[in-house]
Amino acid sequence: SIEGLGPVGRGVFPAAWWAGAETHQLREELVAMPAGGTVVLSVPFGPYRCPPGPYERASLIADYLKKHKRGSKLIVLDSNEKIISKGKLFKEAWDEFYSDVIDYRTDSAVVKVDPSTRTISTNFDDIRADVGNVIPVQRASDTVDLAGLRPEGRRWCPVDPWTYESTVHRNIHVVGDATDATTVGKVPKSGFIANSMGKVCASAVVALINGVDT
């Protein structure tokens, strides 16, 4: 968890990971920020939903800043040791188009935020952000907790890799983002993968109902 990222902290530094009020807030803050300002965007430890998402957002913000907020900077604090999706493409694009805008930093997990001073801290720096987009570490939703499918201390749900049946509770199947990569392999948490998992799972469930080995 990130120190200070409670309700007040989230109000100042929204994740804006799902479309809605927070994405509108982030846009409005970017529009209102004066030229020469500093935007800070954090990337959580993987795995998380939509691996290229934070880097796509960084590219869009950088493009906006370059066109409309001259002299502004975007500091990308990546918790990971490198860009974890399409890294070569993003780095090439950033170097070519936004080298004067993007300051990309690896191994820079956010450990603390101070909403009163708009400060975002890593183990190396304290950065004052005119606009802050802090995306915290992700886990499976509260729904799986209500069903008891996520073991304590784990972020995702372990499943059988052939049937997607929970290894915690029999006859319950989990697909998509909620599955644990240590049991399904290093597949991205994407819509395409979830769709594919659903088809495999449906076939497995039919086989199980009919007493056929999967």
What residues fall within each predicted segment?
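FAD-site-proximal beta/loop scaffold in flavoenzymes
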Residues: 4-35, 117, 127-196
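Active-site substrate-recognition segment that forms the wall
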Residues: 46-69, 157, 165-186, 197, ...
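Internal hydrophobic alpha-helix adjacent to the cofactor/substrate pocket in enzyme cavities
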Residues: 192-214
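Sec/Tat-exported extracytoplasmic proteins
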Residues: 33-37, 98, 205, 209
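Conserved active-site and cofactor/substrate-binding residues in soluble primary-metabolism enzymes
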Residues: 21, 52, 56, 85, ...
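A Rossmann-like FAD-binding core segment of flavoenzymes
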Residues: 63-158, 212-213
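Rossmann-like NAD(P)H-binding beta-loop-alpha module
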Residues: 22-72, 82
